[in-house]
C-alpha cells in the first residue's frame, strides 16, 4: 500500500490511517486485506493447495491451522477436488478461484478484487462475481474494481464510479445509466 499519497483528505482502511501509517505497520495492515488480481498470480510449480497455503506460510501460521483452513477455503470456492492439481491443469475460471481462495484463507475483513474477471470468459465472470457476493453475505466487505458495466448491472449492490481519482457517482444499480459514459469512455 501507499502507492499513492492523497492530495487531500484522510484515507482509513481497517482502522489504519494510510496517510500516517508507519513502514513497520504496513505488513500487518496488508495481512488485514485479501487481494485478487486480474492475472491470477499463481505459482506454477505449486499445487492448488500449496498456492493457497503459501499465503499462510509466509505469515508463520502453524501447520495444523494450515491443514484446516486450506481445505475449508478450497471447498468454499468449489475446488476441493482440485487441491493436487497444478495451475496449468486448470481453466482460467478455476485459476481465478484459486487466487480468490488464497486471498480469503487469512479470513480478511476486506477483500479487494481488482478486475477479477478480466482474463476469463463472460459466463465464468458471472460465477466469480456471484462467489464474491456470497463472500460478502458471509460478512467480508468486498470492493470490486471493474469497468464491465454489464457485470455490475446484474447485481444489486452499491456502485461507486470514479473517474480520474474523483467520485462521480455513488448509488445503486439504477444509477448506472447516468454514469455509463465513464464505463464506455
What are these regions, as identified by a protein language model?
Residues 105-109:
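A short, proline-enriched helix->beta-strand linker immediately N-terminal to the Walker B motif
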Residues 100:
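Hydrophobic anchor residue at the start of the ABC signature
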Residues 85-90, 94-96:
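Conserved ABC ATPase signature
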Residues 1-2:
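Helix-to-loop junction immediately C-terminal to a conserved catalytic motif
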Residues 111-114:
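Catalytic Walker B motif of ABC-type/P-loop ATPase nucleotide-binding domains
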Residues 9-17:
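Conserved ABC transporter NBD signature motif
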Residues 46-54:
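Short coil-to-helix segment of the ABC ATPase nucleotide-binding domain corresponding to the Q-loop/switch region
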Amino acid at each position: 500500500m501507499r502507492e499513492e499519497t492523497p492530495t487531500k483528505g484522510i484515507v482509513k482502511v481497517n482502522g489504519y490511517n494510510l496517510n500516517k501509517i508507519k513502514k513497520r505497520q504496513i505488513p500487518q495492515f496488508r495481512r488485514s486485506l485479501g487481494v485478487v488480481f486480474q492475472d491470477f498470480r499463481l505459482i506454477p510449480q505449486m499445487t492448488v493447495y500449496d498456492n493457497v497455503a503459501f499465503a499462510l506460510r509466509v505469515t508463520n501460521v502453524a501447520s495444523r491451522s494450515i491443514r484446516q483452513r486450506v481445505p475449508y477455503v478450497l471447498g468454499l470456492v468449489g475446488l476441493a477436488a482440485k487441491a493436487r492439481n497444478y495451475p496449468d491443469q486448470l481453466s482460467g475460471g478455476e485459476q481465478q478461484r484459486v487466487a480468490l481462495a488464497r486471498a480469503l484463507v487469512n479470513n480478511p475483513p476486506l477483500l479487494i478484487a481488482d478486475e477479477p474477471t478480466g482474463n476469463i470468459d463472460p459466463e465464468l465472470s458471472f460465477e466469480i462475481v456471484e462467489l464474491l457476493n456470497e463472500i460478502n453475505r458471509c460478512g467480508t466487505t468486498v470492493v470490486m474494481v471493474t469497468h464491465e458495466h454489464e457485470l455490475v448491472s446484474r447485481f444489486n449492490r452499491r456502485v461507486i464510479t470514479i473517474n480520474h481519482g474523483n467520485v462521480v457517482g455513488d448509488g445503486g444499480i439504477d444509477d448506472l445509466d447516468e454514469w455509463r459514459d465513464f464505463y464506455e469512455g
